[in-house]
C-alpha cells in the first residue's frame, strides 16, 4: 500500500514520462549509454503501473477498488502507448526492455485490470507487443510464445 501511495502521489503525466524520475524519451542519436537508461525507464514505468494495478485488486492494501487509483493507472497505460510503447515505434537502448521487461509488466497490469481496460485500448497495447516481439523472433524457441 505504501509504495502505491507514493507512486500515485509522485505521478506527473507529461510528454516523455509518467514520473519525473523516469523520463523515457529517446535520447540524442549516438548516446548509447543514455539510450539504455531511458529504455529501462519504459520497463520501470510499466512495473510501477503493475504495482498500482496489484494494489487496486488485492484486498487490504488501502487502495482496493479505489476508483481514483484505477483512473490514474488506466491513464498511465494510455500515456505509455501514446508516447512510446506502440506499434510502428523504433526502439532504442536495450532490447530486453522492449521485448521482455515492458511487455511483461504491461500485460500483467492489463490482466489485473482486464474488466476496466477498453477493448480498443487492449488491442493497441497487444499490437505493440506483436510489433516489438514478432512471432518470427520467438517461433524457433520452444516454450516461448
Predicted regions and their residues:
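Aromatic-lined, polymer-binding surfaces characteristic
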Residues: 4, 8-145
Amino acid at each position: 500500500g505504501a509504495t502505491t501511495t507514493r507512486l500515485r502521489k509522485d505521478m506527473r503525466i507529461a510528454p516523455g514520462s509518467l514520473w519525473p524520475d523516469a523520463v523515457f524519451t529517446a535520447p540524442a542519436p549516438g548516446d548509447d549509454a543514455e539510450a539504455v537508461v531511458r529504455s529501462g525507464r519504459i520497463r520501470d514505468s510499466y512495473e510501477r503501473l503493475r504495482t498500482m494495478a496489484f494494489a487496486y485488486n488485492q484486498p487490504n492494501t488501502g487502495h482496493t477498488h479505489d476508483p481514483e487509483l484505477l483512473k490514474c493507472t488506466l491513464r498511465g497505460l494510455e500515456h505509455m502507448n501514446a508516447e512510446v510503447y506502440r506499434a510502428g515505434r523504433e526502439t532504442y537502448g536495450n532490447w530486453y526492455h522492449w521485448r521482455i521487461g515492458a511487455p511483461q509488466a504491461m500485460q500483467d497490469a492489463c490482466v489485473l485490470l482486464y474488466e476496466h481496460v477498453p477493448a480498443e485500448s487492449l488491442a493497441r497495447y497487444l499490437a505493440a507487443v506483436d510489433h516489438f516481439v514478432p512471432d518470427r523472433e520467438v517461433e524457433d524457441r520452444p516454450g516461448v510464445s
